[in-house]
């Protein structure tokens, strides 16, 4: 399996949210977006907020971060293939408020497909790209125990074909 950095997907949409409106007995409601981020903009994620990132297409890939935070800060990244919609209607199988990452369709939604990172005592930004796992996802949901600054975020596809093995192109 090869990480194809040359095929890296950049975020198409990214927003932070905190809180929910319109929840009821039959629906989780809708997220309250606190900030939307432009492509290539540094993302500052405060503790207590959730970042949702849309990479624009589903892929077998790993998220790749260039980020910084205080030592001991724990970041959790949850990949998902779709977002909750329809006001988070429980009868439609939604597992959270509209706009949040949907994970009920995963075999091990609570214990699998989870990426945790704990920041060490370093100066400046750290780079992290997992090399011993991969996920199938289009979206990621990111939370942290303290403020995190994300300078760069990409989704790096995995494949069994290196760039050098390619023999043609599709146009």
Residue ranges: model-predicted function:
Residues 1-171:
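Extracellular/oxidizing-compartment recognition motifs
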